[in-house]
Amino acid sequence: MTEQPIPATFGVDHVGLSVRDLASTRAFFCDCLGWRVIGERPDYPAAFVSDGHDMVTLWQVEAPDRAVAFDRRANIGLHHLALAVADRAGLDALYERVAKWPGVVVEFAPELSGKGPKIHFMIREPSGVRIEFAFDPRLEEARKQR
């Protein structure tokens, strides 16, 4: 039996997303989700946003009118970004806010993920990137036990 190596990593540093409209996606993350801009690269252009735990880099595509949307069933790459929500009430309140946000397309409202107990909903943010928001009561219990 081969010995399992010790992991050389300890988490995700950031996720980079190419977006059609940097301004509307940045507004979605900051004004709708409450994230903060922690850096920018106007020459690219790009914005670095964070919720205090995770960082997402938003990269403006060069030619938005010629950008090709990601087909999750045909392309290799990021299927969706999944963000955790602390509790069920927070998930429901977030859904109400996100569903009304300009340019957001709701794929489905909060529902069980498979047979549960995780509850999630899926949207496309204003640039078309799929984002899942999820609450898992098993993680809530684990956090309480710390």
Feature roles, as predicted:
Residues I6, D71-R72:
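Short helix-capping and inter-helix turn/linker motifs at the boundaries of alpha-helical repeat units
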Residues L58, E132-F133:
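Short glycine-/small-residue motifs
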Residues S18-E62:
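Core segments of cupin and vicinal oxygen chelate
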Residues V19-S24, L81-R130:
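Vicinal oxygen chelate
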Residues G11, P45, D54, G77-H79, ...:
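Residues that flank catalytic or metal-binding motifs in active/ligand-binding sites
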Residues T2, A63-A69, F108, E140-A142:
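A short, acidic/glycine-rich surface segment
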Residues M1-A23, L78-L83, P137-R146:
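N-terminal beta-strand motif that seeds the catalytic metal site of vicinal oxygen chelate
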